[in-house]
Amino acid sequence: MYLDRENLFLILFDDINIAYVNGELFQDNVMRDGGALFLGHLLPDDSLKKISSEKGRFRAKQTKFAAGSVFGQVQSTIAAEDDILICDDLGDEWADFIGMNTKGAPPTITFYHAKHGKLTLGAGAFHISVSQAEKNLGRLALPKAAIDTKFYSWEKEPYSNSNKVTAIARVMRGGPRSDIEKHLARLRNSPEVFKRVSIVTSSLSKKA
């Protein structure tokens, strides 16, 4: 049998310390404590308690995302410390938002992935978000040639969705472009910069 011959079976047991992987049975007593370590990376935020959608509805003249949406809370609250904030949603999307705190100690570059869904303790929807974030980790380096191309789309027109062209500027804070490029030139290869990914979701709870 092919699966057996190639040791492709992965078997998990009721005891989370035991797993059968790659044709071998493992016992790792550290696994149970690892859950607490993982939960330490989940940071509750009160601004997400009353969220009703991911992006909200759109009007022709609106200048920011709806307050009741995850996008709206990233723009107004979650990424409030970023003096540069760019909406990169849709198209050649690296993240829903790219934020930079150029004055922090250390300065930070953050990719925000914003998601909404039914409140749950399950990790299914969260896993999808993690997978989407993983594929763009290399782009946290913000390579100059790629950023030059992206600026064209960021500056070309405001954000549009659901057949509505809004007045939401994609470069939300930190412009003009020349100022952002100066910060990028300093931060791009600086050893002190903290590069991170933030999955902002209203669907995951520690105590649902």
Positions of the model-derived regions?
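Catalytic centers of nucleases
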Residues: 75-138, 151-158, 168-176
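Extended, non-catalytic scaffold segments that flank or surround catalytic motifs
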Residues: 28-46, 50-51, 72-79, 119-133, ...
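Generic low-polarity alpha-helical segments
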Residues: 37-39, 95-98, 197-199
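Long, charge-dense tracts
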Residues: 1-57
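Core nucleotidyl-transferase/polymerase catalytic module
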Residues: 1-5, 10-12, 73-88, 188, ...
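Short acidic, S/G/P-rich loop/turn micro-motifs used as interaction or catalytic elements
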Residues: 117-121, 203-208
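Catalytic-core elements of nucleic-acid end-processing and repair enzymes
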Residues: 47-92
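Metal-dependent nuclease catalytic core centered on acidic motifs
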Residues: 143-207
